[in-house]
């Protein structure tokens, strides 16, 4: 029989027990924080109609390039979800009677056929929180406070960068960029920290932006790098949409100060969050130390998505945030922050007394302990070696003598201390 050359699809990976146990812990920590903030659990399908995910209320042109598409037996065009946002918007559109404000969280696999780098894969797990029905920037402030609590609990230091798409839109209007070029220009600006100002200008030229507009953008890039929100409010010309963005940013900034998290938050006038779905506040989360340079979380306000799917003129105010389990796990591993805990509390080793060993294991499991039984009749030295390697704290030995006396032997693997525990065999 031919031996297959097994390997994972590029951009995917297996998580063996020692790794997956940490990821389970991460998910539980995030889920606990989400519930503390009043969020309710939800699950949506991984497979969706391509038209839904590719709609203008989805991720935009850049994400469409990365979608995994397929057809079913009925020749319907389908795609694997690339995030959890549009599936949430679909749920809200299909269930208009959901009481609002509505907070939900979802943890699930998503798929993007994009670049692969440290912590970035093509199949990955996202943890999303979204709030529908609140138009106040206080909703954003609460989500950002929740983010600081998430990273405090898992032991990583991070900072939050934030901006407002209305501010960017207004600046592009002032610079003279045509409306039909706004989305593409914002995508280029979103790459500024990676490619630098010179390359931003080069890409703007390549896409055919007016020369005068490019000159104004270049001047803006040079002048605004160290600007705060107050500079835009007092020292710069504004448009009505820009004034809205400034007011929302000022209200957000005030809330961040009141919540005492402003020291972890930085205004970045060039942060764009390239996805076309966003209509107001946008933010990204970055670790302050370590090798992971890309964001470990992001989000923003997308008031047009739900109403766009329902066809209603009245927007449904919605804001969300997303955390990447895989990139966070990678960061913990790279920084040596993973404190591997044992997966078992007890390891029962029968000395020719398998049925009795099962009875002891069953009793302990009913008390809430994690227990495994050795069934392969390993030599005692090999069984104890397994316990040491897996850092199992207690081993139970059951042989003829233990069954006859009605007491099993309990060994503390850290101290070596032994004791006999009564049990009715």
From Swiss-Prot:
<comment type="similarity">
    <text>Belongs to the class-II aminoacyl-tRNA synthetase family.</text>
</comment>
<keyword id="KW-0963">Cytoplasm</keyword>
<keyword id="KW-0547">Nucleotide-binding</keyword>
<dbReference type="GO" id="GO:0005524">
    <property type="term" value="F:ATP binding"/>
</dbReference>
<keyword id="KW-0030">Aminoacyl-tRNA synthetase</keyword>
<dbReference type="Pfam" id="PF03129">
    <property type="entry name" value="HGTP_anticodon"/>
</dbReference>
<dbReference type="InterPro" id="IPR033656">
    <property type="entry name" value="HisRS_anticodon"/>
</dbReference>
<dbReference type="InterPro" id="IPR004154">
    <property type="entry name" value="Anticodon-bd"/>
</dbReference>
<comment type="subunit">
    <text>Homodimer.</text>
</comment>
<dbReference type="GO" id="GO:0006427">
    <property type="term" value="P:histidyl-tRNA aminoacylation"/>
</dbReference>
<dbReference type="GO" id="GO:0016740">
    <property type="term" value="F:transferase activity"/>
</dbReference>
<keyword id="KW-0436">Ligase</keyword>
<protein>
    <recommendedName>
        <fullName>Histidine--tRNA ligase 2</fullName>
        <ecNumber>6.1.1.21</ecNumber>
    </recommendedName>
</protein>
<dbReference type="GO" id="GO:0004821">
    <property type="term" value="F:histidine-tRNA ligase activity"/>
</dbReference>
<dbReference type="GO" id="GO:0140096">
    <property type="term" value="F:catalytic activity, acting on a protein"/>
</dbReference>
<dbReference type="InterPro" id="IPR045864">
    <property type="entry name" value="aa-tRNA-synth_II/BPL/LPL"/>
</dbReference>
<dbReference type="InterPro" id="IPR006195">
    <property type="entry name" value="aa-tRNA-synth_II"/>
</dbReference>
<dbReference type="InterPro" id="IPR041715">
    <property type="entry name" value="HisRS-like_core"/>
</dbReference>
<dbReference type="InterPro" id="IPR036621">
    <property type="entry name" value="Anticodon-bd_dom_sf"/>
</dbReference>
<dbReference type="Pfam" id="PF13393">
    <property type="entry name" value="tRNA-synt_His"/>
</dbReference>
<keyword id="KW-0067">ATP-binding</keyword>
<dbReference type="InterPro" id="IPR015807">
    <property type="entry name" value="His-tRNA-ligase"/>
</dbReference>
<dbReference type="InterPro" id="IPR004516">
    <property type="entry name" value="HisRS/HisZ"/>
</dbReference>
<keyword id="KW-0648">Protein biosynthesis</keyword>
<dbReference type="GO" id="GO:0005737">
    <property type="term" value="C:cytoplasm"/>
</dbReference>
């Amino acid at each position: 029989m031919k031996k297959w050359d097994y390997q994972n699809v590029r951009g995917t990976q297996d998580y063996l027990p020692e790794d997956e146990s940490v990821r389970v812990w991460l998910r539980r920590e995030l889920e606990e924080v989400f519930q503390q903030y009043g969020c309710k659990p939800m699950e949506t399908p991984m497979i969706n109609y391509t038209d839904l995910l590719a709609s203008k209320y989805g991720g935009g042109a850049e994400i469409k390039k990365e979608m995994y598409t397929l057809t079913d037996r009925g020749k319907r065009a389908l795609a694997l979800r690339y995030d959890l946002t549009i599936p949430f918007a679909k749920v809200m559109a299909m269930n208009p009677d959901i009481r609002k404000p509505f907070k939900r969280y979802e943890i699930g696999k998503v798929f993007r056929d994009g670049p692969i780098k440290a912590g970035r894969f093509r199949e990955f797990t996202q943890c999303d929180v979204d709030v529908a029905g609140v138009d106040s920037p206080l909703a954003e402030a609460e989500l950002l406070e929740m983010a600081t609590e998430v990273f405090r609990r898992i032991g990583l230091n991070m900072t939050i960068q934030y901006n407002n798409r209305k501010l960017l839109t207004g600046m592009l209007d002032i610079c003279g960029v045509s409306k039909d070029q706004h989305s593409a220009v914002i995508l280029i600006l979103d790459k500024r920290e990676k490619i630098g100002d010179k390359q931003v200008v080069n890409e703007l030229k390549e896409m055919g932006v007016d020369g005068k507009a490019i000159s104004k953008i270049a001047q803006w890039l040079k002048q605004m790098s160290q600007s705060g929100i107050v500079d835009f409010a007092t020292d710069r010309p504004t448009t009505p949409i820009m004034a809205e963005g400034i007011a929302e940013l000022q209200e957000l900034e005030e809330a961040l100060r009141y919540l005492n998290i402003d020291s972890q938050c930085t205004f970045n006038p060039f942060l764009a969050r390239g996805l076309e779905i966003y209509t107001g506040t946008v933010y990204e989360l970055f670790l302050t130390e370590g090798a992971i340079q890309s964001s470990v979380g992001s989000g923003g306000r997308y008031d047009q998505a739900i109403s766009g799917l329902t066809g209603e003129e009245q927007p449904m105010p919605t804001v969300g945030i997303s955390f990447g389990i895989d990139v966070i796990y990678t960061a913990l591993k790279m920084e040596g922050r993973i404190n591997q805990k044992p997966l078992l509390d007890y390891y029962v080793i029968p000395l020719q007394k398998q049925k009795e060993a099962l009875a002891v294991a069953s009793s302990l499991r009913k008390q809430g302990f994690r227990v495994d039984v050795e069934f392969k009749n390993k030599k005692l030295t090999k069984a104890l070696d397994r316990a040491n390697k897996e850092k199992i704290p207690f081993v139970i030995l059951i042989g003829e003598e233990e069954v006859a006396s009605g007491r099993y032997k309990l060994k503390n693997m850290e101290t070596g201390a032994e004791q006999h525990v009564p049990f009715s065999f």
